[in-house]
């Protein structure tokens, strides 16, 4: 698989994940605390995909590195918000566990890409 093929597939994966999270957030309880968490979760999950897309379009190595660093931060934040929902006891569904697993996998992938720049 070429880098271009990987990037296209991963852009689709992060976009699909963001759409899944948007739908998940719409189904969370309408409690004041969950509105805040839901908002932050939607922001970080959509930013992960958007910043990976920007990484793919980077014009220089420095620009790509800056974008992949932001992508790692946003992916890590997404894992955080999902884990917080679990730990708060607001949800313990298989849907949440699947989202935690997918967000963790996405984080590992973008962290690995970032580490290739650090070498």
What are these regions (language model features)?
Residues 1-119:
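Amphipathic alpha-helical assembly/interaction segments
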């Amino acid at each position: 698989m070429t880098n271009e093929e990987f990037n296209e597939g991963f852009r689709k994966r992060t976009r699909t994940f963001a759409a899944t999270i948007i739908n998940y957030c719409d189904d969370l309880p309408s409690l004041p605390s969950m509105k805040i968490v839901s908002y932050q979760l939607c922001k970080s999950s959509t930013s992960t995909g958007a910043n990976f897309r920007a990484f793919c379009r980077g014009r220089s190595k420095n620009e790509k590195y800056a974008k992949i660093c932001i992508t790692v931060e946003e992916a890590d934040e997404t894992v955080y918000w999902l884990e917080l929902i679990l730990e708060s006891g607001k949800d313990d569904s298989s849907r949440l566990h699947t989202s935690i697993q997918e967000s963790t996998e996405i984080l590992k992938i973008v962290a690995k890409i970032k580490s290739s720049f650090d070498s």
